[in-house]
Amino acid sequence: MSFHKEDGVNSLCQKALHIVTELCFAGQVEWEKCSGIFPRDRGSQGGSSTDISVSLLAVVVSFCGLALLVVSLFVFWKLCWPCWKSKPVTSNITTLPQSISSAPTEVFETEEKKEIKENEKPAVKAIEPAIKISHTSPDIPAEVQTALKEHLIKHARVQRQITEPTSSTRHSSFRRHLPRQMQVSSVDFSMGTEPVLQRGETTTSIGRIKPELYKQKSVDSEGNQNEDVKICGKLNFTLQYDYENELLVVKIIKALDLPAKDFTGTSDPYVKMYLLPDRKKKFQTRVHRKTLNPLFDETFQFPVAYDQLSNRKLHFSVYDFDRFSRHDMIGEVILDNLFEVSDLSREATVWKDIHCATTESIDLGEIMFSLCYLPTAGRMTLTVIKCRNLKAMDITGSSDPYVKVSLMCEGRRLKKRKTTTKKNTLNPVYNEAIIFDIPPENVDQVSLSIAVMDYDRVGHNEVIGVCRTGLDAEGLGRDHWNEMLAYHRKPITHWHPLLELPGRATSFDSQGSCPSPKPPSTP
């Protein structure tokens, strides 16, 4: 009986517990009343809330870490990206000398310590890394890289110094600053010397200045003439410019050691002075009787603007006065550069040698013309291009120039042609061609006489100056003719100085025997 009673009580207890559980979890009874009945469920409920808070904390920490990582990446990109971005740009812009020299510098700095410890090792190992690094530069041509590598390997031992072995590679790296156009194989990399071009100079010397190409014949000829000119005394004068009144003040002080022109062994000297190219304004000193060392002490003034002084020349002519005949010229002094001594702001004293001369050398101007000869047609063309700085022949300070060309043979004038007249100018431009028929067999027998004339409506036309060209001419006239014969069918152009007419009979109107040129054979 007792056994059945216990079973009934247990079943009732289980049913009661089941009912209480349903009521507590259904929410119909306050949880505080049920907490004493279900202690384990309370602990599990607290554990579940703890698990939820831990998971939330883990989520927050993960989010903060991710945000910190993003910020770190952003800062790293801002700091390092400009450097990486600039590397390809600078490598493309850098020229060949920079691309070659930048790589070996780092390599040689690391190799210095090795060379101090191991002096017996060849320098080729230190050079090869530099060459390999330079291969990465896109600006270096493959041919230059190959030539540079071969030459550096060949001259590796030469680059060492006995006293300072560590500096040899460093200096050799600087010597590789070569232009792109220069041939590397033609440069000497030896220490202590500058690169010297050898056989490759002819193909790589583009852009180099060769002074011998700029030598002018006129300068050389003037130097030779100055060596042959005889000195006949010295002239002392002073120069100063008056800025307020725009005047060039010239004071002729004295002359020394003049030659004797009279039979008594003395002279009666005086000085005439021009400021070229203007000959209208002329000054003359007093005549000093019977002396070879006259003391003039006279001052003259030329009205001229300061900015025009660079284009002016001061011309002194020393004469011997003769009462009964023509005055004899002793010599002359020409000061080409007025700023030779100073800027003329203060009085400058000048001593010049007097060059002996029998006639006064006058700057008559220059003429430019071209010569062209066609041997097959037997035709010579002289093109008068222009003149410059002609002598003023009219009282107005200008001229009416034209050019007359005469075909001469042994002093006889065969034909003559002339250009049009240009009015009131000292720098006429013509561009007119004059043609003469000259067979090839007669070219060596003829010459051309060119005279610049001043047209005068009332009186006779005056000769300003003349020049000649031909095999029998002198200086530039002969050279111009020979150059024309050497280069057929090609116009040869030169400037020619105009000279004074030595005599009408010898230049234009003299008669002589000369075979007339045969007409060119017609095919």
UniProtKB/Swiss-Prot annotation:
Listed CDD domains: C2A_Synaptotagmin-1-5-6-9-10, C2B_Synaptotagmin-3-5-6-9-10
Residues annotated to bind Ca(2+) 4: D394, D400, D454, D456
Protein name: Synaptotagmin-10
Membrane topology: Single-pass membrane protein
SMART domains, sorted: C2 (SM00239)
Gene that specifies this protein: SYT10
Modified residues (Phosphothreonine): T136
Annotated stretches, region: Cysteine motif: 13-35
InterPro entries, per database record: C2_dom, C2_domain_sf, Synaptotagmin
This protein's UniProt keywords: Calcium, Cytoplasmic vesicle, Disulfide bond, Exocytosis, Membrane, Metal-binding, Phosphoprotein, Repeat, Transmembrane, Transmembrane helix
Topology Cytoplasmic: residue spans: 77-523
Gene3D superfamilies noted in UniProt: C2 domain (2.60.40.150)
MF GO annotations: calcium ion binding; calcium ion sensor activity; calcium-dependent phospholipid binding; phosphatidylinositol-4,5-bisphosphate binding; phosphatidylserine binding; protein heterodimerization activity; protein homodimerization activity; SNARE binding
Principal place of residence: membrane
Residues spanning the membrane: 56-76
GO CC annotation terms, alphabetical: exocytic vesicle; glutamatergic synapse; plasma membrane; presynapse; transport vesicle membrane
Vesicular topological domain residue ranges: 1-55
